[in-house]
């Protein structure tokens, strides 16, 4: 019937570093931000959960003062682009709609699951979004050559299931971000 419960945008290049006036970090257009901005302009509340190994500085900057878009980032720190600290929580009307969870090199799935259980899921539930976007970078996979997190394919599946449970069917959009080990991506 042409309907699906989850949409997956397998586009390249990734987008979460791109800001409105320039490309950054392999990213030309901020694909997740374009979709979220369109929905927010129509009065919808959108949560973007970014689990790429790098902080999505572009997405954070675009929505930093927007109360209708919640941005949550889990990422390795220190690592490019050097942003995404705990103290970066939003500005103006957007204070409290930006959450960064920086993790050290070597962090594995058990820590991510605890972060989802204790922080991310409760924050997203309180925000009560109409839509959830996942900026799905798979460069935190333990086999990825560009960083040092220790996530597995099963960890990503678990995080996706937890986020899918937070919104009705057909309200979850997954946008491919980074990931440079082709076997881990498949």
Give the role of each language-model region.
Residues 1-186:
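A general "terminal functional-core" signal
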């Amino acid at each position: 019937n042409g309907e699906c419960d989850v949409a997956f945008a397998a586009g390249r290049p990734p987008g979460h570093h791109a800001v409105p006036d320039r490309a950054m970090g392999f990213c030309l257009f901020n694909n997740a931000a374009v979709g979220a901005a369109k929905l927010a302009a129509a009065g919808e509340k959108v949560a973007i959960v970014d689990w790429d190994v790098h902080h999505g500085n572009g997405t954070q900057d675009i929505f930093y003062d927007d109360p209708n878009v919640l941005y949550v980032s889990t990422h390795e720190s220190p690592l490019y682009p050097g942003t995404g600290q705990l103290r970066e929580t939003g500005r103006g009307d957007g204070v409290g709609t930006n959450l960064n969870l920086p993790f050290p090199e070597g962090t594995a799935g058990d820590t991510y699951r605890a972060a989802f259980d204790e922080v991310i899921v409760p924050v997203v539930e309180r925000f009560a979004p109409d839509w959830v976007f996942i900026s799905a970078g798979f460069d935190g996979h333990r086999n990825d050559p560009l960083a040092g997190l220790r996530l597995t394919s099963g960890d990503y599946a678990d995080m996706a299931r937890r986020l899918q449970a937070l919104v009705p069917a057909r309200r979850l959009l997954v946008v491919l971000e980074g990931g440079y080990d082709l076997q881990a991506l498949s």
